[in-house]
Amino acid sequence: MGCISSKSTQTGKKEGKTAAERKAAWEGIRHGLPRRKTAEDKARRIELFKKFDKNNTGKLSME
């Protein structure tokens, strides 16, 4: 069992976004996720979890 990768990753050549673009993208993700210890963020985390918990088991599954 191994990891299948393209030739571009094997040669070490980076294609696509620059480091600054990737950093900006992650900043956007961080700002969009409810990470603070506030009541509002906690409520948002609960709502997000409910969207992912399709089986209503209190667990995340691969289905």
UniProtKB/Swiss-Prot annotation:
Biased composition (Polar residues): 1-11
Keywords from the UniProt entry: Calcium, Cell projection, Cilium, Flagellum, Metal-binding, Repeat
InterPro entries: EF_hand_dom, FCABP_EF-hand
Region (Disordered): 1-23
Sites where the protein binds Ca(2+): 53, 55, 57, 59
Keyword Calcium: yes
Bias (Basic and acidic residues) ranges: 12-23
Any one Gene Ontology molecular-function term assigned to this protein's record: calcium ion binding
Localization (cell): Cell projection, Cilium, Flagellum
Domain EF-hand: 40-63
GO-annotated cellular components: motile cilium
Pfam families: FCaBP_EF-hand
Family recorded in the similarity comment: Belongs to the calflagin family.
Protein name: Putative flagellar calcium-binding protein
